[in-house]
Amino acid sequence: SAGFYAVGLAQNDFKPVVITSSGTAVAQLLAPAIEAFYDNRFILFLTADRPKSYRSSGAPQSIEQNGIFGSYCSNCLDIDEIPNNEIYMDDSKPMHINLCFENPLNWQAEEQTKYLSEKLIFNKLASESSQLDLVGDELYVISRLKENEVPAVEKFLKNNSVCVLLEASSQIDKDFSGKA
């Protein structure tokens, strides 16, 4: 899971951020939060949540996310608007920021996702020169792809030495590590 992957990164002195949807997806992060807490490692858990008014209403994906990690996070913020001041982070313990969204934000997120996947990423991968100038410690997470996008992504992976996390929904099952 993304949570345990983040624990591994934290053990190697990275400061990972896990972003997840609402509901039981958040609950799946409890065990990684406990691991990071007892290992004195920082992980920032950013969780999307339904509006605060949905709590205790029985609405889908409206479990009580605020404080779900209990004492295993140094801080838990329940945010439904942009804070006016700085947020304190203890970089030796996990932290949870629960972001409560109203429905009008959905269309913006979908538009941004569509733009990022189709314009920025896919167009670069499909271009004639699929050799990209990659600098630094980058991780590419490849999730659900359209069938026509798979060949371009496979070509990119074959021609570039990058760290990749392939989700099952990506439809990519080849080994591009150069190892048998």
Each language-model region and where it sits:
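N-terminal alpha/beta PP-like core and its mobile active-site loop of ThDP/TPP-dependent enzymes
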Residues: 1-180
